[in-house]
C-alpha cells in the first residue's frame, strides 16, 4: 500500500509490470472518493544486505508419517 501524494489517504495498487529485472512500475489509485488520483511509482532493488553463497541441494525432511519422498 502506498499513500496518495495529494491527500495522504491510502492508495491501492491496481496493476504493475517489470521494467527491468530489478525495477517494477506500479499504478496506484487513491481510495479517497473526493480525490481518486491515479499515479505511478517505481520499486527497485538498491543494494543487497546479504547475498546467498553457493547453494547445495539437500534432501527434504521426512514427512510426519516417517516416509521419505522417492527421487526418480
Curated annotation (Swiss-Prot):
- Gene Ontology biological process terms from the UniProt entry: positive regulation of DNA-templated transcription
Question: Disulphide bridges in this chain?
Answer: none
Output the InterPro entries linked to this UniProt entry. Answer: Znf_Ogr/Delta (IPR007684)
Positions of transmembrane segments: none
* Reported effect, residue 57 to A: In strain: B6
Q: Which UniProt keywords apply?
A: Activator, Transcription, Transcription regulation
NCBIfam families, sorted:
PRK09678.1
Q: What does this chain do?
A: Cryptic version of the phage P2 OGR protein which acts as an activator of P2 late transcription.
- The name this protein carries in UniProt is Prophage late control protein OgrK
What phylogenetic lineage does the species belong to? Answer: Bacteria, Pseudomonadati, Pseudomonadota, Gammaproteobacteria, Enterobacterales
**What gene, per UniProt, encodes this protein?**
ogrK
Amino acid at each position: 500500500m502506498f499513500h496518495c501524494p495529494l491527500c495522504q489517504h491510502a492508495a491501492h495498487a491496481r496493476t504493475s509490470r517489470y521494467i527491468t529485472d530489478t525495477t517494477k512500475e506500479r499504478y496506484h489509485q487513491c481510495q479517497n472518493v473526493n480525490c481518486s488520483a491515479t499515479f505511478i511509482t517505481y520499486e527497485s532493488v538498491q543494494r543487497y544486505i546479504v547475498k546467498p553463497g553457493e547453494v547445495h541441494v539437500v534432501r527434504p525432511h521426512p514427512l510426519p508419517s516417517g516416509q521419505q519422498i522417492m527421487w526418480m
